Design a protein with these regions (language model features):
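Structured alpha/beta reader/binder surfaces that contact nucleic acids or chromatin modification marks
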Residues: 1-114
Length: 114
């Protein structure tokens, strides 16, 4: 199963279902299917989500893709992304990874016949 380390402060947002996407730059490629998030501050904490879509777009278009353009204007988006990727620019292509919440993932898995 693909896995991805996630900043400790973001981990509860995934668990609660508030965070349903991640934006990656120059990282291993994600693909639709199960994905395990691993909390960077405590690697014993993990949660599985179902990746539903992966799309490559310039960073300047990523906020609109996930419906956050009102709260993530370019300046805010660039500042936030530079906390993780200091050299990133608005015209750099990023991978936007969208996924179900953990609860939706469990329900989707339970609905599959083995």
């Amino acid at each position: 199963m693909q896995s991805l380390k996630l900043a400790e402060w973001l981990f509860p947002l995934v668990v609660s279902g508030e965070k349903t996407h991640t934006i990656r730059w120059r990282e291993p490629r994600m693909h639709p299917g199960p994905m395990r998030y691993v909390c960077e501050g405590d690697t014993e904490k993990t949660v599985v989500v179902l990746v539903t879509r992966c799309e490559d777009v310039p960073l300047s278009q990523a906020a609109a893709l996930v419906g956050k353009q009102d709260i993530w204007p370019d300046k805010v988006m660039l500042s936030g992304m530079r906390e993780h990727y200091p050299d990133i620019e608005l015209d750099d292509v990023v991978q936007v990874v969208e996924h179900l919440t953990p609860r939706q993932t469990e329900a989707a898995h339970a609905g599959k016949s083995d």
